[in-house]
Amino acid sequence: MNKLAILAIIAMVLFSANAFRLQSRLRSNMEASARDPMTCEQAMASCEHTMCGYCQGPLYMTCIGITTDPECGLP
């Protein structure tokens, strides 16, 4: 294999690991938010406060699920 193919494989493995870690974190935060529900307004304020970047558009519901995480769900 040439070097470019090896680098591409390494990049795919790293990307997969990060995606799995983010998915696990989002799932655990969704479970936590189900135990301690927030109103939409509280979630939006918390999301804006922590600057998680998921406050706009179709990912707003994701923000509601991750606002209990101090890192706001980012890797």
Curated annotation (Swiss-Prot):
The keyword Disulfide bond applies. One of its GO terms (cellular component) is extracellular region. Its main location: secreted. Coiled coil: none annotated. Residues 20-35 form a propeptide. Residues 1-19 form the signal peptide. GO terms for molecular function: mating pheromone activity. Keywords: Disulfide bond, Pheromone, Secreted, Signal. Disulfide bonds join 40-55, 47-72, 52-63. InterPro entries: Pheromone_Er2/Er23_protoz, Pheromone_protoz, Pheromone_protoz_sf. It is found in: Secreted. Homodimer. Mating ciliate pheromones (or gamones) are diffusible extracellular communication signals that distinguish different intraspecific classes of cells commonly referred to as 'mating types'. They prepare the latter for conjugation by changing their cell surface properties. This is Mating pheromone Er-2/Er-9. It comes from Euplotes raikovi. The lineage of its organism: Eukaryota, Sar, Alveolata, Ciliophora, Intramacronucleata. The gene is MAT2.
